[in-house]
Amino acid sequence: MNKEQLKELIEKEGDSLQWSYTCSNGVIIECSIHRNSMLALCGYITLTPDNTLYGIGYDDLDLQAHGGLTYNSYDDNNNWVIGFDCAHYQDLNPYFLLSEEEYSFGQRGTYRDMEYVKSECEKLAEQASRFSKSIVRYNKISQII
């Protein structure tokens, strides 16, 4: 991908996306994507207190996402947000390719586009949905019945 192609794609994609994702078990998880200051996309899911993963730091979560989890924080509504970024080894970092400066790193690799990051967010949401307290209760009751 050359500079012009990347510029066009970034302009077409925009800098953010938000949606509600309904997981295969019926749990609804809010997802979002934001472009960071280095122009790489970052994906996030929002967990409510109904999820047993609520408040647990990303280093302590056994969840898989592109490059591993790299973010956690409470949002303005006191929900727990966890996320990942697409600025890892083997990722094309848009800033380094589009910059006027000459960099020897970050210019090769694969650009992780909005569709890729959306898919990763939804995979992360599916994993986290298993820890919804309502799903955990349902599974326990199903084993008893």
Regions found by a protein language model. Name each.
Residues S32, Y44, V81-D85:
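Generic structural signal for residues positioned in beta-strands
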Residues S32-I33, S134:
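Intrinsically disordered, low-complexity regulatory segments in eukaryotic proteins
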